[in-house]
């Protein structure tokens, strides 16, 4: 498997967002600024709450097939690879990791089978597009910790994806969960979210390496990044952390993570989080405390790193 140097683009972008020329300009700027060789495009469907069994990807709040194709067209025009990623968010704001149902059947209560039927339908829809556009990798889900134990249902979902998509298939488990997923064997690639503390990268990488060795699968970080807030280098996964603005925090974390990647050549890809379709002004970058790297020092670190490895 070739190394994927990806950046996530357009998370939670609505239907029709690519009709705004500035959105696709942002995508081009992403490739130019970071040197990434892969577009990682997340299509985030919606369900009402963590106990809902109906998933909606047709709403105006979710990017359309037309949007997906427009983004892929830009990537191909620039000679880039493509990862399509299925996600689901809860409309009430609860994190998708809390999606969960009773393991024992209870009349009148929501059922695992109903949720997986809806989520499988969504995946088949997106996997068909992935096949048609020739995506190099398809990711069937993201950080769905509450669902991870339902191995048989996940195996069924992956089997349906493979009926319509012939490329590599993965699942993006949450940080610290790599060893808890028992069904990596039905996938081609193990992937996870790499929001690990700056002072614990060696330990976490070694732990993950053991999982990859056990299953004899390639591994990549489907997500990783760090906000620009004091303390975020130790809890980069916490998007709600209220530390004071500190651009250097992100810079230090990225430098450490890039060095760790170079020291662990068994890792075969990374997906940086994230790049917005609606960018903040460049002259306001040093006032932005979020995960974005646009016009921040971390952007230059990524570009230099990708150039060093001949990807930019």
Region annotations inferred by a language model:
Residues 20, 95-96, 149-158, 173-189:
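Distinct, well-ordered alpha-helical segments
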Residues 121-122, 137, 144-172:
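Active-site neighborhood of glycoside hydrolase catalytic domains
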Residues 34-53, 66-147, 276-278:
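Substrate-binding cleft and catalytic face of glycoside hydrolase catalytic domains
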Residues 63-65, 70-71, 77-81, 85, ...:
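Glycoside hydrolase catalytic-domain groove-lining segments
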Residues 18, 264-312:
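Aromatic-rich peripheral "rim/lid" segments of glycoside hydrolase catalytic domains that contact
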Residues 16-32, 116-129, 174-183, 251-260:
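Short, acidic/polar
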């Amino acid at each position: 498997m070739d190394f994927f140097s990806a950046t996530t683009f357009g998370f939670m972008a609505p239907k029709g967002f690519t009709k705004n020329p500035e959105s696709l300009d942002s995508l081009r700027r992403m490739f130019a600024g970071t040197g990434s060789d892969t577009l990682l495009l997340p299509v985030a469907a919606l369900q009402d709450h963590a106990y809902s069994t109906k998933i909606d990807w047709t709403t105006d709040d979710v990017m359309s097939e037309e949007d997906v194709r427009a983004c892929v067209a830009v990537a191909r025009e620039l000679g880039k690879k493509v990862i399509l990623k299925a996600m689901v968010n809860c409309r009430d704001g609860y994190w998708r990791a809390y999606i969960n149902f009773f393991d024992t059947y209870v009349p009148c209560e929501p059922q695992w089978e109903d949720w997986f039927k809806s989520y499988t339908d969504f995946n088949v829809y997106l996997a068909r597009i992935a096949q048609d556009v020739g995506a190099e990798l398809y990711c069937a889900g993201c950080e769905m910790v509450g669902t991870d134990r339902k191995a048989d249902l996940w195996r069924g979902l992956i089997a349906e994806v493979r009926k319509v998509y012939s490329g590599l298939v993965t699942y993006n488990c949450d940080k610290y969960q790599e060893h808890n997923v028992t069904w990596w064997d039905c996938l081609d690639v193990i992937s996870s979210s790499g929001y690990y503390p700056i002072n614990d990268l060696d330990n976490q990488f070694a732990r993950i390496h053991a999982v990859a060795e056990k299953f004899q699968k390639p591994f990549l970080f489907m997500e990783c990044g760090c906000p620009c807030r004091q303390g975020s280098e130790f809890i980069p996964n916490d998007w709600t952390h209220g530390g004071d603005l500190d651009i250097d925090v992100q810079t230090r974390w990225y430098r450490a993570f890039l060095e760790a990647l170079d020291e662990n050549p068994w890792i075969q890809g990374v997906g940086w989080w994230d790049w917005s379709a609606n960018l903040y002004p460049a002259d306001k970058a040093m006032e932005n405390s979020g995960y974005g790297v646009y016009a921040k020092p971390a952007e230059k670190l990524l570009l230099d790193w990708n150039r060093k490895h001949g990807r930019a």
